[in-house]
Design a protein with these regions (language model features):
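Interdomain hinge/linker elements that couple catalytic modules in large macromolecular machines
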Residues: 1-105, 109
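A cross-kingdom feature that marks ATP-driven nucleic-acid transaction machinery
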Residues: 87, 95-170
Length: 170
């Protein structure tokens, strides 16, 4: 990544270039951490493409919720997936799962579905297909930046509002 390049060029050079170190990085990292990467890949892909509840994840993956739950717990312990509950609630049936790591979230959301195009060296076409969805992807990134900023302001004594935790509600 380079701050001298546009977002488009950075994405093309890193994620849409088969010669880039990041092109296969999430899959390679996962293979180092788990014994059965296929089901883990399927779960991460399901979450990256919109499944957020355990029933939705298991439906997309084609496995029972019990099996998926065990794999999701491992992904949580690896810091790849996170479980969120609505702000102010303890354990909740409203819990949702999301990809915690921005690189994993981007890669699993956009690279696999464009893999054939990328493999043929058509980074421009792949980017053209990705670009309309970048603002959706950046929504969660922006939320996280805002949370980090608020915590920094609070800890430095510069936040006009007192709080002890931050979260989302749905």
């Amino acid at each position: 990544m380079s701050d001298k390049l546009s977002i488009e060029d950075n994405i093309k050079n890193t994620f849409l270039n088969t010669n880039s170190a990041l092109f296969e990085e999430p899959e390679n990292l996962l293979k180092q951490e788990v014994r059965e990467p296929a089901l883990y890949n399927a779960i991460i892909t399901a979450i990256a493409t919109g499944a957020s509840r355990m029933s939705e994840i298991s439906g997309k993956v084609g496995e029972s919720t019990n099996i998926c739950s065990a794999y999701v717990k491992n992904l949580i312990s690896l810091g790849i997936i996170e479980k969120e509950t609505p702000y102010g609630e303890k354990a909740s049936r409203k819990a949702i799962y999301s990809i915690a790591d921005n690189m994993f979230r981007f890669w699993y959301r956009f690279v696999p579905e464009n893999n054939s195009i990328i493999a043929r060296g058509a980074a421009d076409l792949a980017y053209k297909r990705i670009e309309p969805y970048l603002s959706d992807y950046m929504g969660k990134v922006f939320e996280e930046i805002c949370k980090q900023y608020l915590w920094k302001q609070l800890l430095s004594g510069e936040c006009p509002v007192e709080f002890s935790s931050l979260g989302r509600w749905w």
